[in-house]
Swiss-Prot record:
Pfam families: CASP_dom (PF04535). Keywords: Cell membrane, Membrane, Transmembrane, Transmembrane helix. It is a multi-pass membrane protein. The chain crosses the membrane at residues 25-45, 72-92, 110-130, 159-179. This is CASP-like protein 1U2. Residues 46-71, 131-158 are extracellular. Belongs to the Casparian strip membrane proteins (CASP) family. Homodimer and heterodimers. The keyword Lyase does not apply. The keyword Lipid metabolism does not apply. It comes from Sorghum bicolor.
Length: 189
């Protein structure tokens, strides 16, 4: 009967504890975080406000956007590609049956390939933007006092992209670490 047990926990009829699925839940959470951060970084960089820089004579004006810097374009494209790959990885992870030992090997291989591709895309794009910010620092900093928020958006986008990169690594590692906890819903047996 429900509620008659003094332990406060539900007792299962077959008295077999469900297998721990904590690493699957943690991996799913980290994949969702990676997806959100990569997409946020790409959108933030793509919407970086235009900045107009006036020359010393006051008449010469240059308009600067993220499209003027190839690493910024690469960050937008790579982070969008990483977002799409993370969506595919989430679909494969949720849809496959990795809780049983005789599960097909193809989804596991796909997840490894996607994990490597996402990390490659995010780290290469983030590194390129960090290098570009150092190389083009004076040009980007010239926009700091302008009406747009180009410089701030570039800085935020590169930090968010770095966070997405770290989250992707943690998701790949957490996938292979057995966590002794079990998270609802319990896998069906």
């Amino acid at each position: 009967m429900f509620g008659s047990d003094d332990s406060g926990c539900h007792v299962m009829d077959d008295d077999v504890a469900p297998p721990a699925n904590g690493s699957k839940a943690v991996t799913l959470l980290l994949r969702l975080i990676t997806l959100a951060l990569a997409l946020t970084s790409a959108v933030l960089m793509a919407t970086a406000s235009e900045c107009t820089i006036y020359g010393l004579d006051g008449a010469t004006a240059t308009t600067v956007t993220f499209k003027d810097y190839q690493p910024f374009i690469y960050l937008v494209g790579s982070n969008i590609a990483a977002t799409i790959l993370e969506v595919a990885a989430i679909y494969v992870q949720v849809g496959k049956g990795d809780d049983v030992e005789d599960a097909p090997m193809i989804p596991r291989v796909v997840l490894v390939v996607v994990d490597v591709a996402v990390q490659m895309l995010l780290y290469s794009a983030t590194g390129a933007v960090f290098a570009a910010v150092m190389a083009y620092g004076p040009q980007i900093s010239a926009c700091t006092g302008a009406a747009g928020h180009f410089c701030e958006q570039v800085q935020r986008s590169k930090i968010i992209s770095l966070a997405a990169s770290l989250s992707a690594v943690l998701a790949a590692v957490a996938k292979d670490v057995a966590l002794p906890c079990s998270v609802w819903p319990h896998p069906s047996s």
